[in-house]
Amino acid sequence: MKKIVVLGSGMVGRVMAADLAADFEVTAVDVSPANLDGLKKTPVKRLRADLSDAAAVRDVVRGCDLVVGAVPGSMGFATLREVVAAGKDIVDISFFPEDSFLLDDAARKAGVTAVVDCGVAPGMSNMILGYHAARMSVERFECYVGGLPFQREFPFEYKAPFSPADVIEEYTRPARYVENGHVVVKPALSDVENMDFPEIGTLEAFNSDGLRSLLATMKVPNMIEKTLRYPGHAGHIRALRDSGFFGGEEIEVRGRRVRPLDVTSAVLFKHWRLHEEDDEFTIMRIIVEGEENGRPKRYTYGLFDRRDRTTGFSSMARTTGFP
């Protein structure tokens, strides 16, 4: 039986591990005993290790046939680098800020296949665009995606269905999109627009850095990705960000050195924590426009998925982690 190691056993990682265990020998690795305990009732082997330690990463992947990366974005690139150095193929969902193509030469030399950003969007969205790009001349690609709770609680009306640290990263990382063949960079949370969805009503969409590898792999003159939230969310987050609450530089408070980001994260995570009983959904709309067989063509895809109450798997974990 093939052996798979899943690095990270958070809200999405442990669901992938449990699903894969039906057909493979799976080991889940995480530094958190609480995260690993979520797999107690599954056949998944559990291993506690600090994946911020390069030597530990190489050690835990030794002897496996495939690695699945599901660590927080802040650790994603370094973890990917060590897996590539160990000569292991990897499918990764980490939302890291670094350019994955910096490891392209190393992966080629090691004979490693690394599929990165393999989630909903980026991930499924890339595959849909690739499918159409092979069959038509694509002129425009638009992707709108988000994961939200059904229960709206003031003021943020949001719960984090994956690493909360990666959520804040979405709100602070500059957003890149393509307009008339040129890459445009704008602040995250910019260009807010309202969109209507039959399944849930009106949501707001704003710029986020979700095109990722598409910026390098696809020659489409117009491409954009936006994140979906309940109306008003972007304004609340912009107020925090622009006031310095996401700052990474230490400041002194009552004789102690602290980072505003760490304090804000601790406060927000209490409100944003997605509990097992919280009903949530994932929603996505993809639009592909161009010329096919000499005629203008427009394709629209819609995804709407909600928590599986039987298994307890969140919608974001299902849509991200299931093949």
Regions found by a protein language model. Name each.
Residues 93-116:
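Rossmann-fold NAD(P)-binding glycine/threonine-rich loop
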Residues 51-63:
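Conserved Rossmann-fold cofactor-binding substructure of NAD(P)-dependent oxidoreductases
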